[in-house]
Amino acid sequence: MTRNTSRLIGTAGVTPGSYILSECTLTASDGAEFDIKALITQIVITESIYSASIDAEIIIMDGVNLFESAKLNGDEKIELLIKRQELDTKNTEKHQHTFYISEIIAFARKRNGSSTYVFRCVSKHAYVNNTKTLDQFKEGTIGSIIKGICTSDLRIPLKELDVNTSTYKNIKCIIPKLRPLAAIKWLNSNAFTTTGAPFYFYETLKGKVQYKSYEDFADSDVVATYIHSPVLISTIGSKEYYAETSRRINKLSSDLNLSKYIASGEGAYASTTRSIDIATKTYDVKGQQYNYKGVKKLNGYDPFPKRNNNDQYGGQPIDKIASGKNYFISSNSLAYGDKQFNFQDPSIDSMGKCQAYLSTEDTIVHDIVIAGNFNLESGQLIKIQVNKTSAFDNESDPIDKMQSGKYLVASIIHKFADEYTLQVEIKSNSFNSDLNDVLTLEGTKGSTEVIET
């Protein structure tokens, strides 16, 4: 891999896929440093709101006997700096991160004079996680407990943390001999906002180790708008070309998986929570009945049609079938004294709505490929604009409202090869179009005519 991509004017990028591999330094076990920029053929870095650490795969073509010279053994440090200068503003954007090799895999000698292998890398706190287990008493909000684990056990500096500590209820618990990241996952299973939204613990390449709720995501501003357009209208090298390709969706695909059958079975729209208090031997038979309401939607319309004549749901509206999904929770109201909440207590009030968030967050999912963006990260909101398949026949209204709208960036695969590209998984928990507003063509009765081509 050359240190620069070919699409540069001086040090400025002609396209959003341009970048400069400015630094890639490997520190061996004995402290010796090696500049390995010239040996790299590809870098792939993955981040996700479901992953506690970013990870990287660095593909090496070794023609200088690095493996023996550095005595590679699988715990080396790699300091990475990738940057780009914008063509019009001359502002410099960058990704800078310190990784630690977790595995060296895929060794091969396919030609004389060189060998290939792959460094799999993780962040420092993921490495630290493997060195200890926790079996401590903790109290406070779950968010504050998680923040404490990050700073004291995972040794993450405060400046590299962004933790929402305002989780529902102060609790007391004993962590049952878990590694720090497993303890955070265990605690997070009972972490909610005051209105029942779930939390996510994750790391991004651009930012910090973060702990945020779905409400935090939904309340944030849209950071970019991307357009799925079949043609480019500007000339390469111009400012207009850079701007146009920056917001263009190059590929869009989806497994779709739209299913009210599965969602209703998961309690996405209605459920009942039943609890037993083992201290007082009382059972809440009536339960906490939840019907879909109060969920913060990314777009304006619910993820289900509002109708009453649902034969498949026993003639009930889909958001009223609360007996179809039941959650059973054991609590101990006297574990730490009167009016002291133990670990399970927040779930009694919040489990139904939390599951509604979790079951509807991927109501509609797309995988898109876009040009490299140094400022896009998981947990942000974007808008996409998708043209109708018959856009040329609908010039007055060419936008597909069902596919367009606000989406949450759930994961990003940063790929640095000939160009910098992003493969982004985006999700929305709602629609940009009313599902009750079914279009009817002239000359049909209560249905839409479909013309086969």
How would you label these PLM feature ranges?
Residues 1-4, 18, 161-164, 437, ...:
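Interface-prone segments of viral and bacterial extracellular assemblies
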Residues 1-131:
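Assembly/oligomerization scaffold segments
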Residues 22, 54-56, 76, 95-97, ...:
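Envelope-exposed proteins and targeting segments
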Residues 43-72, 233-453:
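An acidic/polar, Gly/Ser/Thr-rich interaction patch typically located in mid-to-C-terminal regions
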Residues 56-59, 121, 130-160, 175-202, ...:
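Amphipathic, non-transmembrane alpha-helical segments in extracytoplasmic/periplasmic proteins
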Residues 62, 84, 123-125, 205, ...:
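A mature extracytoplasmic/lumenal domain signature
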Residues 73-81, 225-227, 236, 379:
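Glycine-centered loop/turn motifs
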Residues 116-118, 123-125, 162-258:
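Short beta-strand-centered interaction patches in the first periplasmic/extracellular domains
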